[in-house]
Each structure stands twice: as C-alpha cells, then as structure tokens.
Amino acid sequence: MSGGGGDDVVCTGWLRKSPPEKKLRRYAWKKRWFILRSGRMSGDPDVLEYYKNEHSKKPLRIINLNLCEQVDAGLTFNKKELQDSFVFDIKTSERTFYLVAETEADMNKWVQSICQICGFNQAEESTDSLRNLSSASHGPRSSPAEFSSSQHLLRERKSSAPSHSSQPTLFTFEPPVSSHMQPTLSTSAPQEYLYLHQCISRRTENARSASFSQGTRQKSDTAVQKLAQSNGHCINGVGGQVHGFYSLPKPSRHNTEFKDSTYDLPRSLASHGHTKSSLTGSETDNEDVYTFKMPSNTLCRELGDLLVDNMDVPTTPLSAYQIPRTFTLDKNHNAMTVATPGDSAIAPPPRPPKPSQAETSQWGSIQQRPPISENSRSVAATIPRRNTLPAMDNSRLHRASSCETYEYPARGSGESASWSAEPPGKTAVGRSNSASSDDNYVPMNPGSSTLLAMERPGDNSQSVYIPMSPGPHHFDPLGYPSTALPIHRGPSRGSEIQPPPVNRNLKPDRKAKPTPLDLRNNTVIDELPFKSPVTKSWSRINHTFNSSSSQYCRPISTQSITSTDSGDSEENYVPMQNPVSASPVPSGTNSPAPKKSTGSVDYLALDFQPGSPSPHRKPSTSSVTSDEKVDYVQVDKEKTQALQNTMQEWTDVRQSSEPSKGAKL
C-alpha cells in the first residue's frame, strides 16, 4: 500500500476501471486497487488513487477530487461481461471515470464516501424525472413506493436486493422497491395514464411495423380514405362516377357499375394507378370506362392524382403489349389520355397489330403520329421509357420504373382518318391547335407528385406540354423531337432507369467513407454506460468546483497527470512541445523545460561544426526554436568560409597559448 499517513485513508478496495472514452472498444476494463484519501486534516488535496495491486508503491494515477463535478451511481451498461454489474462514475473536468464494483454494498460505500468528501448533494430533478420514466416503462409492475423523495441517500438501497429487469423495456435496471420509502406522488395523478401512454407508443410501433409487412391493399385503402376525405368522389375504395370523375378500383375488386362496358386488361398491361388516382374529363355520365386489374405496387403509392378523362388502352393476349417491336408496356404504369368533352360514347379501340405485321425500327423510336383534329381521339398507352436493351423479359418489366409513362397514340382507331407527322417544334399530347408552344410548357419536377395534365371541359384546342430530357439511347429516325412523349416521374424509382444519377457507393468492392462515422456514433452510445431509473446523481449545489477548491485554500494538485507505471501507458501520454525535452519533468512547474530545450537548440544549430563550440553564437541562437533549424541549412558559402577561417584561427591561438601556460606552471 502506498505511503502516507493511515489517518487520511477513507476507503480502499478493488474496482474495475474503464479506459478513456475514445478507447472503450479497443482496451479492456482493468482491475485496480483504489485508495480514497482525505486531506482535510493534513492540508493535502482530496484524491482518489489507484494502483496496479495492493503492494504497489507508486500510483498509476491520482484523481484530484477537487476537480470532481458529479457522481452517478447505478448506471446501466450494455457490455456483456458488465451487464449485471454495479457501475458508478466520477465526472471530472479532465475525464469521466467509470468504475465497477463487485457488489451493490461496495458501490454504495464508495459513492457515499466520495460524496461526503466532495460535499455533494443528490440531484433532485434528475432523480424524479428518471423515476417517472421508470414507472412509465414498467407499467403495472411499478409500485407507488418507487416515487420517493430525492433526499434519501444511496445507502438506503442496501436493504433492497438488486433486481434487474428481464423484460425488453427501455431500461435494463428495474427500480428496487423499498417499503420504508414514502411516496411523494399525489393521488390525483393517475398511474394508469403513464401506462396507457406506453401502450399507445407500443401500438404505434406495431402499426408502423405492420405497415411494412402487410400487402398493398391496406396501403391503398389508406390512400382511398385520404382521397375520399379531400375530394369526396371515392368511397371505400370503389370508384364512383361523380361529376365527371372516374376512379380506378382497387386490385382484385371489380366495379359492378360499369360491368357491361368494362374492358379488362391482362395482368401485364395493368396500370399501377391506385384508387388515389382520379380521372377528370367530360361531364356526361354514360361514357365507357375501362377498369384495370391493377397490381399492387408499394413504391408508387405516393404519386399524385393523375387527371385524365378515361382509360382507353388496347389489350393483347400476349404477355406484354408491344407496339411494332418498339415499345413494351410495363405492368406498373399509369395511363394518361385527353378526352373530348363533347363525346358521349366511345367504342373500345381495336386490338393493335401483331409484331409480324409491323415495321421494324430501332428500339425506343416513334413510328407514326395521328393527325390532330377535333374529331380525332388519341388513345393513350402506358409505355415505359426503354433506353437500354430490346430484350425485355417479364422480370425486367416488373423491376422497371412504375413512375414514368409516355402517352403514345395507338394505331387503328376508328375515329382517326389518316396518319400524318406533326411539326417537330410542336408535338401535342392529345390534340392541340395552340399558336404558341412556349406558353404551354410546364416545367417538370422529378421529385414532385403533382397533377401533370388537366383538360378543361370548355376548351377543345388547349392542352399542356411537358418537356422531357431524353436518355442517351433515345433514337428518333423520323425526325420527331424528344418532347413528343411527355414524361412524368415519381419520387420512388425513377433513378433506377436514368443513367446520370448513379450512386457509385453501391458498388460491391467500393468502400464507403461515411460508414466509420456512423459506427463511431453507435459505439459511443452502446459502449458508454447510461443512466437508468435507479441511477442517482450527486453534485454540488452551484455545480461549480472552483469555489469549493478555493474554500479549502488548497492549490490544484499537479499529480493528477503523474503516472510512472507502464500498465496504463495509453492514458498517461503527455504531449511534448520539443522532441529534445524528453527528460522527466519534476513536480512543480514546467518552467525548467524551455531552458533545457534552449540549450539543446544551441548545439543543434551548430551541428555542422561539431568540434568547435562557438561562444559568441549563443546570444544570437538563444531565441531560435527547433522549427527554425532549416535556416542553418541554407547558408551563404562566403560567410561560412569566413566563419570557418575565423574559428580555425581562434583554435590555433588557443592551442599555441596552452604550452606557454604549461611552461609557466
């Protein structure tokens, strides 16, 4: 045991000490012999020393308790080997020391002794708040006796056995029940409120997890309810024909209202448009509406309402609708078209020609465009943007973007008189006789889910243009501009198709740089002990330690950084100003260090002349630091030669005078 009077030793014992906070993962918690010394009688500072073992003479470290700010007892630690241990900490201005006792009685003894020496009082606010959280987390298992007043010291916990919660609650420790503690919580505050609040929070988590695990029907029902509350046109997911709004039904649910005039698409042609989408167009109630068997798509559920008139989409018995080998329909795309308000009944469009009857052209190009007239109707087909390979299987179609559609007029419509090409400068979505195309262009926001196109019932010649930026492989052999196919993007999966926004951090062999930052934050939270409902904190009333240190009229000890044992070398590093000041610093002040380093710098400055100590250079080099040694490397040759000659002459004179002195003696 260390020297010193035995009267000042307050407490001794074995404790496990934590490494520094930044090294909790790399270094182990070491067992050390701690001695608590009180210096009130001798005038020395109050210190907590720890040694390598009981018989060590020199302490590994001396913790000055005058710098102690707070003491917390009953901390919770997630580390496996220390999960059920009794952890308390000592917070100083330099570092926070986490100490682990073997029993709860030992922890209470150390905490009580340290608090008595430092003059700490228990923090009332933190204790009450933590106990309220404890009652909320444990629910009916908590008793009213746990809401005790905070002036009880930690020694009252000796009578209660340590109990730890095995339930997956927020905290690991369960507050012990002390029968002699008096509850301070008023009877007017019902305890069931806290328990119900916890139940509500857990129910929210269950609902959140269920929203990710269930199918899209529940999600689409939520979207239908939102739409029904905002517009009042859709009720319980069934599309109703109210004031010209046609709503798409939910998946696997048929609309019996339009059963005779329903045009069912195959599964590969079904649009992803959910019940949240509504169609606007003419005011008549006898128009045919083609309902879709829509697949469930969880990624495009958050798109905005698509305002179109009706869903005139041709079908085919094939697995995918192919317009003469140029476009392939995606099963998850919305269909958009523009309707004439004056039309009363529209016959279903004829089936498209088979691929063998069509012309072959490049992938992603447009074959022909219908004429733009008042009596003509452009039939819209949902065509995904395909800029890569022409060989598309069903799995590729399912993975394709369901937030990006084209409006393409189908061929063979009964109302189309002829096929003609439009001018490249103005290519309409449906039909347009507008004179200026600049006024009709609407800027497109790829991340928005707003309404893209809406046909006014009273205007037959006005439509909306939406510019589109084509991909690198979008070819147009007939000279049509790329804006002929307006595109709308959703916020969910548009980035999978466009090649420019490539996230190169997703490559398998690429090391992501932000990963260590996240791990560092997680390790700090997981590795550090945290407060639990049974944690009690002690600190000074004014939370200042300078007044307490001046109260005892003792200087701050410089031994708090003193360490000579190699066992804790990782925490005893003292940064040096100069590499030549490696000599041990005596206890007291650091003033002798610059003097020694200055003398060493003089010899380093004259290192190019090792055998000649020049006394007249000392005043000039006394203020030179080690960082300015490079000035002596780049010297003038003439001055150097003159200096060497002078030194040689001085050496010769000294050698010639020595024999004469010897002769005189």
Curated annotation (Swiss-Prot):
The modification Phosphoserine is found at residues 2, 135, 142-143, 149-150, 160, 165, 211, 220, 261, 278, 282, 365, 402, 420, 469, 532, 612. Residues 131-184, 338-396, 408-445, 491-517, 548-632, 646-665 are annotated as: Disordered. Phosphorylated upon EGF stimulation. Phosphorylated on tyrosine residues by HCK upon IL6 signaling. Phosphorylated on tyrosine residue(s) by the thrombopoietin receptor (TPOR), stem cell factor receptor (SCFR), and T-cell and B-cell antigen receptors, gp130, IL-2R and IL-3R. Phosphorylated upon stimulation of TNFRSF11A/RANK by TNFSF11/RANKL. Dephosphorylated by PTPN11. Residues 8-119 form the PH domain. Disruption phenotype: Mice are viable and healthy for up to 15 months. However, they have reduced number of mast cells and develop osteopetrosis. Ubiquitously expressed. It is found in: Cytoplasm; Cell membrane; Membrane raft. A motif (SH3-binding) lies at residues 348-355, 499-508. Belongs to the GAB family. Part of a complex composed of EEIG1, TNFRSF11A/RANK, PLCG2, GAB2, TEC and BTK; complex formation increases in the presence of TNFSF11/RANKL. Interacts with HCK. Interacts with SHC1; may mediate interaction with receptors. Interacts with SYK. Interacts with PI-3 kinase. Interacts with GRB2 (via SH3 2 domain). Interacts (phosphorylated) with PTPN11. Interacts with TNFRSF11A (via cytoplasmic domain). Interacts (phosphorylated) with 14-3-3 family proteins SFN, YWHAB, YWHAE, YWHAG, YWHAH, YWHAQ and YWHAZ; prevents interaction with GRB2 and attenuates GAB2 signaling. Adapter protein which acts downstream of several membrane receptors including cytokine, antigen, hormone, cell matrix and growth factor receptors to regulate multiple signaling pathways. Regulates osteoclast differentiation mediating the TNFRSF11A/RANK signaling. In allergic response, it plays a role in mast cells activation and degranulation through PI-3-kinase regulation. Also involved in the regulation of cell proliferation and hematopoiesis. This is GRB2-associated-binding protein 2. The gene is Gab2.
